[in-house]
Amino acid sequence: MMGRFHRHDDGTVHTHEHDHHPHDHDHGDHSGYETETQRIDVLEEIFAENDVRANFNRAAFESNGIRALNLMSSPGSGKTTVLQATLDELAGEFAIGVIEGDIATDLDAAKLSGRGAQVSLLNTSNGFGGECHLDAPMVNRALPGLDLPALDLVIIENVGNLVCPAEFDVGEHAKAMVYSVTEGEDKPLKYPVMFRSVDVVLLNKIDLVPHLDADVDTYIAHVREVNATATILPVSARTGAGMAAWFGWLRRFAGDPED
């Protein structure tokens, strides 16, 4: 069985492992089967095509004076709750568009409606790898659902998954992730791909720390082991604790000269 394919920062793709199965037949040519090299070539082509479309998306944003943020997390981290609070705070200051990615349903999109932002829903169940991430062609298909010339900021809420979304450029200018204390302090060490890729980490649900065997400093230290430069913001989207720092980061990112 082939191992999982992974893309490095330089664009190269490789498998992590090859699972050997017990048998005594010859490992010669298996007619009709792709070799590992052939499969890697196909994946590199997919990534290359994705990067072309990502650059197209980024150019579309920039031609309209838009800053785009890719917001990622594992399922249940509180990403949508963070986004709700963000719209409530900033929609009066910036014209915000949201591309809401989910495998199915419009539940999260419905939570964001009526908060002063344009929302374009993107269900991913039919796309390549769509069960676990957004890619640039998917985001491109969502753009007609937004009035780009009217916007200042687009937030792309990616599918809840701790690995795959970080490997696909969707045309953003920065990546952010929501990481909740309920996920455990070891996640940056066990699943470093996303943590390495982001510009800002929101350590969410800190209001639950008194009820957990958890130490915020340990969470932060583990993030620092894999990403020495990311901004780390302990927050509670539910209570509002620490969220002012996140709003300030977004204001600077979106180009507000007053912040």
What annotation goes with each model-predicted range?
Residues Y33-M72, S77, T86-H173, G184-D186, ...:
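Nucleotide-state-sensitive switch-loop elements of NTP-binding domains
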